[in-house]
């Protein structure tokens, strides 16, 4: 919106300059006096839009792996899963290398969620196998994250349980990146909004130092500033997505 306002102002400024030049040149010319007067009226009607500095705040999302990933990342062979009589995964086979960035797209959104749950060990496949490389460490963003916050922790306590470094200042540094500051740290996670919970989960992923990120619709509940920050963080991420 601000860019559009700037472009509109630029066009108005060009028009103002054009009108001023005509008025200056022909205001004393009897044959052009009516045209000059008309342009004066047009000039008076042009108003530049007031552009105020943006008050929007952007989180700082930066996923930094603690360990460089090796060549062998993930091997999936013949993975199948049936739920309530419906075949969700059918003989799925693929491999991931160290430079891969993969998006799972299909008509059944449930399929990728089930695949992720299998790959992180929350669910067993009916058939097939998968194997993570020995140098990999995974961080998972679940589509349904309600259970992650079904406790009495405050935000700082909640994130500390996932951090190897238990120093409060260290943990709050990650929360600060996600726009949690001051008294926010003692807010109970159970009362957080959807967007705040997503920012907590992204803090958890950052603090993990994982070199493989599995994200299941992470932009739900996020505002445009947070989505932009997440996109920038993923672009810079040197690991596997």
Residue ranges and their predicted role:
Residues 1-60, 126-127, 162-166, 170:
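Extended, highly charged alpha-helical segments
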Residues 1-7, 63-241:
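ABC ATP-binding cassette signature C-motif
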